[in-house]
């Protein structure tokens, strides 16, 4: 996890209105994603999940995708993507998402009530994305085995967990202090 932590410490921070936003390859694709850092993150995720407890990986567009794809390839488990645009397929579920800097809609396809899911995402900030996705998965009736985010910058993670009814496993916890990323663990 050394590579992941070091790369986070060096991540630039910009302001989106009043919201401090860190820029990192695994959360933004900028600069380019170092395969060693991605592998580091995937190895850490594998340590905190039970790989026999789910049959499908779910990743949220956009930056949950590199993590989800790498996990899918490593574990040889199928992956589905929660998209930001509709396809109009039978069974598609739309949820409304609100983050610290935007609002939008997410569209869930290729999940059924028979699925047991591993939900992965790049970062937890406000909890808006995870909350919306979990609500949609609950509507479908699928089971959630684990929820894992690579980077947690939410100081109130327990409130998000209480709201969604699941523990959120995190790989690295950070905070933004004086315009810089501080790794907490």
Curated annotation (Swiss-Prot):
InterPro entries: HGPRTase-like, PRibTrfase_dom, PRTase-like, Pur/Pyrimidine_PRTase. SUPFAM superfamilies: PRTase-like. It catalyses: IMP + diphosphate = hypoxanthine + 5-phospho-alpha-D-ribose 1-diphosphate; GMP + diphosphate = guanine + 5-phospho-alpha-D-ribose 1-diphosphate. The keyword Endoplasmic reticulum does not apply. Gene3D superfamilies: 3.40.50.2020. PROSITE patterns: PUR_PYR_PR_TRANSFER (PS00103). It is found in: Cytoplasm. It holds the Pfam family Pribosyltran. Keywords: Cytoplasm, Glycosyltransferase, Purine salvage, Transferase. Signal peptide: none annotated. It is an enzyme of class 2 (transferase). Homodimer. Belongs to the purine/pyrimidine phosphoribosyltransferase family. Archaeal HPRT subfamily. Catalyzes a salvage reaction resulting in the formation of IMP that is energically less costly than de novo synthesis. This is Hypoxanthine/guanine phosphoribosyltransferase. It comes from Aciduliprofundum boonei (strain DSM 19572 / T469).
């Amino acid at each position: 996890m050394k590579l992941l932590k070091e790369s986070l410490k060096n991540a630039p921070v910009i302001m989106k209105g009043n919201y401090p936003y860190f820029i990192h390859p695994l959360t933004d694709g900028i600069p380019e994603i170092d395969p060693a850092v991605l592998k580091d993150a995937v190895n850490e995720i594998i340590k905190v999940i039970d790989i026999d407890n789910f049959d499908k990986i779910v990743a949220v567009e956009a930056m949950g995708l590199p993590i989800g794809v790498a996990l899918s390839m490593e574990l040889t488990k199928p992956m589905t993507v929660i998209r930001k645009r509709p396809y109009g397929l039978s069974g598609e579920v739309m949820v409304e998402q609100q983050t610290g800097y935007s609002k939008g809609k997410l569209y869930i396809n290729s999940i059924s009530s028979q699925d047991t899911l591993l939900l992965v995402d790049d970062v937890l900030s406000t909890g808006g994305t995870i909350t919306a996705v979990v609500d949609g998965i609950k509507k479908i009736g699928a089971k959630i085995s684990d929820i894992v985010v690579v980077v947690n910058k939410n100081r109130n993670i327990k409130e998000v967990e209480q709201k969604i009814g699941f523990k959120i496993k995190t790989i690295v916890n950070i905070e933004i202090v004086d315009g810089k990323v501080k790794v907490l663990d």
